[in-house]
Amino acid sequence: MSAIENFDAHTPMMQQYLRLKAQHPEILLFYRMGDFYELFYDDAKRASQLLDISLTKRGASAGEPIPMAGIPYHAVENYLAKLVNQGESVAICEQIGDPATSKGPVERKVVRIVTPGTISDEALLQERQDNLLAAIWQDSKGFGYATLDISSGRFRLSEPADRETMAAELQRTNPAELLYAEDFAEMSLIEGRRGLRRRPLWEFEIDTARQQLNLQFGTRDLVGFGVENAPRGLCAAGCLLQYAKDTQRTTLPHIRSITMEREQDSIIMDAATRRNLEITQNLAGGAENTLASVLDCTVTPMGSRMLKRWLHMPVRDTRVLLERQQTIGALQDFTAGLQPVLRQVGDLERILARLALRTARPRDLARMRHAFQQLPELRAQLETVDSAPVQALREKMGEFAELRDLLERAIIDTPPVLVRDGGVIASGYNEELDEWRALADGATDYLERLEVRERERTGLDTLKVGFNAVHGYYIQISRGQSHLAPINYMRRQTLKNAERYIIPELKEYEDKVLTSKGKALALEKQLYEELFDLLLPHLEALQQSASALAELDVLVNLAERAYTLNYTCPTFIDKPGIRITEGRHPVVEQVLNEPFIANPLNLSPQRRMLIITGPNMGGKSTYMRQTALIALMAYIGSYVPAQKVEIGPIDRIFTRVGAADDLASGRSTFMVEMTETANILHNATEYSLVLMDEIGRGTSTYDGLSLAWACAENLANKIKALTLFATHYFELTQLPEKMEGVANVHLDALEHGDTIAFMHSVQDGAASKSYGLAVAALAGVPKEVIKRARQKLRELESISPNAAATQVDGTQMSLLSVPEETSPAVEALENLDPDSLTPRQALEWIYRLKSLV
């Protein structure tokens, strides 16, 4: 900023601004001046563009007009939300000195920094979505990655071993803000991500990190958290914690532990798999028609966020899964009673975070009170549920009768938004406050009595007593009667049609009332702060309660979904394999207008790979995806859309389904396809579930076929993964004859004339034909193009039996499977009965056939 070059030429107020701005050069500074937050110089220009507000000038300082933009303090949340959504950070600078006693500019300081990853304000957060701050670190041995949800205190770290795993973690967590070291080598991994923040190297120093974390948790070492031997993760966590403290400018008591996320604890899904399975986001980037949209009927925002975390991190510990299954089964008869009560609990998790940060507002405390009021009813309903896990949740939930009583006494029923407006603390809670309020509230009665008395004394019927924010209390007399005003009336203000006066008695009362209002407000703020001190010692128990309530919400929701959508409880088995009876796609069955065709699936060590053939639109992709989604649902502990499911251990789910050009990275469809395939072949194991759809279609026929064949061979023979391999290369249906553990299945279609009906039913064996031209006709390709395609197909078939789709034995199949028109001569011959012809008739037929050829 050029303004700093001639610092001494500026006014004292602008010097103060420039000093504060120099401490936060990269971010916008909201500088409090009275009822406005002002921005100056480059900040003003940026803010005017980002917020679409007027850019004006404020006088001159150092001989130059100062660009300025301002926003009213009471509307600051709306403007902050806009800036945060655009990835901006804002330093909030408040007046902390008293203007009445200040010599020179009022003392100001930055009280907090609002950044996309550290927001906790309700207005700035998406209710049903986690908002994560993350830090990434890299050395020669791999990556370190840490995430913090400041609105709940959830602190996690991991150590992804390679680039693919790191990319998958970034996709899964989708941080709002990402801190990285200034020498970070893999910039291509994070380029284009929102909220990137470059940090100095020393912030990632391991010893500092250990010191910071021990200080935060009040421990001597980190052994108890299981992170002692995770140096890369700790480097990231140390930087992240320091950044959170710097921005919040306060202690963070709700961050009490850190958890190590290990690969072996959950089913790993790479970025492509999460995208293709449309877990919480569809391929178009929306939330409709996703797995979460079907499964998430939770009634609290914190429950919704927990369910989405479960969906993105399916657990492999069968003890946890069996416990969840048992709980869902036990709760099925109780959902109708529990859900309306749970809905009243609200977002206790985030309210507690704001309490810890001391930014909770009066309505937060009122909502907390309302949540506490639901606990007795919830505990009473759960008491009759015969399930140990449910009873454990009930205990963890607690009751907090004392805190409920405290908030019922302290906070009025419907408090205002902000404590600075007063009227938050209930009457009867504090005797001194009640006295000051009585004095302030008695003003109305006093003024009415004074008005009646003065009218009678003076005989002036236009006399009125009132109050004005600028001039205070006054006695008003119309211009026509003002000459009759008593001698002790001192003129205070002249209006067009009236005169306003003050008398010593009224002035004295005014001082008393204004003093009492000020004292009442100051005492109210003090009592409000003391409430925090009374609540915060219970923070740990309250956070446990919020976690239990969120988990209960998720499990009650899954119980309701299982009952409503006719799901069944899957069985876990020890050996790799998946056996599904009448499986359904959880999302597709909800959007179809007609009944969904359920299909079986059988994968086992003896039947590891299914080669899936059939027409386009026949349902191959749906069949494959539904298998992966059923597996994923089973591994969050949910019931699943099928009649019966048995499922073995799964370590990873891979999908190579569909592809689009990655133009931004300069990668073609085929390059994207091969990159994803390489990742699968390098990382899949015999416990992995692999979906491969149309491998090799992005290149020439023989190249594609060769690649598809080699990939299938590798997966079946070497890796031995559980694989669903969909293809249009009919040559691949020969694989079961050449290797063990491979089987053919197909999806059928029926033709009638020029129309085609897809049966969506999975049958054993290979498909007998393809239906490419029929699907093209169905899509509306012009008839002359279809006709020309048929001609070309016949030409190709006559040249080479392999040029188009072939049967397993190598003979050519018609893609449309409409037989060629029969020759009239052949038709006539077929209708002839040679034994019934006379010699004369036979000769006539020879001439007739000759003419037909």
UniProtKB/Swiss-Prot annotation:
InterPro entries: DNA_mismatch_repair_MutS (IPR005748), DNA_mismatch_repair_MutS-lik_N (IPR007695), DNA_mismatch_repair_MutS/MSH (IPR017261), DNA_mismatch_repair_MutS_C (IPR000432), DNA_mismatch_repair_MutS_clamp (IPR007861), DNA_mismatch_repair_MutS_core (IPR007696), DNA_mismatch_repair_MutS_N (IPR016151), DNA_mismatch_repair_MutS_sf (IPR036187)
SUPFAM superfamilies assigned: DNA repair protein MutS, domain I (SSF55271), DNA repair protein MutS, domain II (SSF53150), DNA repair protein MutS, domain III (SSF48334), P-loop containing nucleoside triphosphate hydrolases (SSF52540)
Residues holding ATP: G614, P615, N616, M617, G618, G619, K620, S621
Alphabetically ordered keywords of this record: ATP-binding, DNA damage, DNA repair, DNA-binding, Nucleotide-binding
GO BP: any one term: regulation of DNA recombination
Coiled-coil region: none
Function: This protein is involved in the repair of mismatches in DNA. It is possible that it carries out the mismatch recognition step. This protein has a weak ATPase activity.
HAMAP family in the cross-refs: MutS
Protein name in UniProt: DNA mismatch repair protein MutS
Natural source organism: Escherichia coli (strain K12)
Gene that this sequence comes from: mutS
